[in-house]
Swiss-Prot record:
Gene3D superfamilies: Carbon-nitrogen hydrolase. The active site is at E45 (proton acceptor), K127, C162 (nucleophile). Optimum pH is 6.5-8.5. Belongs to the carbon-nitrogen hydrolase superfamily. Nitrilase family. InterPro entries: C-N_Hydrolase, C-N_Hydrolase_sf, Nitrilase/CN_hydratase_CS, Nitrilases_CHs. It comes from Talaromyces marneffei (strain ATCC 18224 / CBS 334.59 / QM 7333). Nitrilase that hydrolyzes preferentially 4-cyanopyridine. Pfam families: CN_hydrolase. This is Nitrilase. Its EC number is 3.5.5.1. Residues 5-283 form the CN hydrolase domain. It catalyses: a nitrile + 2 H2O = a carboxylate + NH4(+). SUPFAM superfamilies: Carbon-nitrogen hydrolase.
Length: 322
């Protein structure tokens, strides 16, 4: 296993509600990252076909036409579109954690597929609890989604979606899996809007999401790749976001790469800029903060506090045998 790894975090605008266009752009970004020598690349939450922000700003009845399009442009894990992405990853010889809206039957899930340098999906997970209004669109991941970390030639790579970073027990379970490089997949998150126009909470801002990702690095002593979406004015109407006070354009991005002590390892880019942030990391640097804090080792008290995990995958239908 290589100790020095070049990592990349995507900050980019999706090809909204367009599956084929989304796949084309995904492959383009993989090729661009490969040309820059990236070994591990992280994409935002539901990068394909974009995060439908209008569910937060419009009534369900005023949003139904977008959700119908959204369902038809979500990607199946075993599909020709995914095969194209897998081929691009194989050609690049990297590890990719891809966030997308997964269609399985007639249901959608907020998925992350872990694709290794051979182009194989070596792990697939779904957000275990979509947040608030998200539950009107996406279903929940089951026990297989508790596994967050894979072994790779570039280290142990993990990933969570958005507010899964605010699930302390899930974070702890990922730490116990030995994560070294963590992909923090986020949608676009914006600045605090004018309180005279809307009652909004700080925890739903890019700054708060940035800090939550940084805390993961500090608490888990892992490198963290923060991947986020952006929104430009040209796509406001397409997303049914005209006139709302929350989604300021261009904006939404807050991508960053953190070291295992929480230190930023690259320069930030503007919230509305397209970029692949990169950093060369040394996995041996993890030992430095681990010597101070190992929350699943010497800095734990399992005799007093411990985590109980149910790994059983429930089935919708079980056929009994006589």
């Amino acid at each position: 296993m290589s100790k020095i790894v070049r990592v990349g975090a995507v900050q980019s605008e999706p090809v909204w509600l367009d599956l084929e266009g989304s796949v084309d752009k995904t492959i383009s970004l993989i090729e661009k990252a490969a040309a820059d020598g990236v070994n591990v690349l992280g994409f935002p939450e539901v990068w394909i076909p974009g995060y439908p922000w209008s569910m937060w700003t419009s009534a369900v009845i005023n949003n139904s036409h977008i959700i119908h399009d959204y369902m038809n442009n979500s990607m199946r894990k075993d599909s020709p579109q995914m095969k194209r992405i897998q081929a691009a990853v194989k050609e690049a010889g990297m590890v990719v954690v891809l966030g997308y809206s997964e269609r399985d039957g007639a249901s959608l899930y907020m998925a992350q597929s872990f694709i290794d340098p051979s182009g194989e999906i070596v792990h697939h997970r779904r957000k275990i609890k979509p947040t608030h209004i998200e539950r009107t669109i996406w279903g929940e991941g089951q026990a297989e989604s508790l596994t967050c970390v894979i072994d790779s030639p570039f280290g142990k790579v993990g990933g969570l979606n958005c507010w899964e970073h605010l699930q302390p027990l899930l974070r702890y379970y990922e730490y116990s899996q030995g994560v070294q490089i963590h992909i923090a997949s986020w949608p676009a998150e914006f600045e605090m809007p004018d309180p005279k126009k809307i009652a909004w909470l700080y925890h739903e801002t890019g700054e708060a999401s940035y800090r939550a990702s940084q805390f993961f690095a500090i608490e888990g002593q892992a490198f963290v790749l923060v991947a986020s979406q952006i929104l430009t004015e040209a796509n406001v109407e397409r997303n049914n976001l005209t006139g709302n006070p929350v989604t300021k354009t261009p904006g939404g991005g807050f991508s960053m790469i953190f070291g295992p002590d929480g230190k930023p390892l690259c320069e930030p880019v503007d919230a509305g800029a397209e970029a692949i942030l990169t950093a060369d990391i040394d996995l041996r640097d993890i030992d430095k903060p681990k010597a101070f804090i190992d929350v699943v080792g010497h800095y734990a008290r399992p005799d007093l506090l411990s985590l109980l995990v149910n790994p059983t995958v429930d089935k919708h239908v079980t056929t009994m045998k006589k």
